[in-house]
Amino acid sequence: GGRIYGLVGHNGSGKTVLFKSICGFLSCDAGFISVNGKVIGKDKDMLNEAGIIIEEPGFLRTWSGYHNLEFLYTLRNKKDKKHLYSVLEEVGLDPALRRPVGKYSLGMRQRLAIAQAVMEDPGILILDEPMNGLDKNGVKEIRELLLRKKEENKLIILASHNREDIDVLCDEVYEMEGGVLRKL
C-alpha cells in the first residue's frame, strides 16, 4: 500500500508555502525538496505525477462541474468520458448535474476539486484541507476515497486543521510551526 503523511499547524505557520514548494510553484531559499526520489524544480515531470488541491481552484463558474473536468481532461489528450463520470460519482457528485459551478455550495466545489486531483490517477496527491466545507457524510466519503487511494499505493500528503482527519487517515504526522517542520 501507499502512505498518508499528515501536516498540521496554525494559520500562517507555513503549511501552504511548504505545499507550494513541494509542487514546484515556489522555489526553496536553501536546500531542495525531493518526492519519491525526484528533486522538485529539476524534474519537470513531477507536476504531471501529482494531483493537487492547494487553494480554491479556478473553475470556470459558468460551466458545469463535468464540463470543467472534461475541458482539463481533454487538454491532456484524454478521451475516456466514462472515466470522468465514475470520478464524479466517486467523490459524490452527480455527473449529470448541469448546474454552473458558480451555483455550487462550498462542499460541492470541494468535491469537484478532489475529482480534479484524482481524475488522472496520479501517484501523488498533495491536498491542503481537502475536507474543507464538506458535511459529515462528505467527510466520511472522502476519507474512504483517500484510504482506497492509499491501498492503490498512492503517496498522499494531507494538511488539515481537523485532528480527527489526521488521526484517522495518516501514517505519519508532521507539524509546521514558524516555518519549521518537525515530526510528531
Residue ranges and their predicted role:
Residues 8-10:
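The feature captures the beta-strand-to-loop junction immediately N-terminal to the Walker
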Residues 23:
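Helix-to-loop junction immediately C-terminal to a conserved catalytic motif
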Residues 31-46:
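Conserved ABC transporter NBD signature motif
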Residues 70, 81-96:
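Conserved ABC ATPase "signature" region
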Residues 114:
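Hydrophobic anchor residue at the start of the ABC signature
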Residues 125-129:
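Catalytic Walker B motif of ABC-type/P-loop ATPase nucleotide-binding domains
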Residues 160-161:
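H-loop/switch region of ABC-family ATPase nucleotide-binding domains
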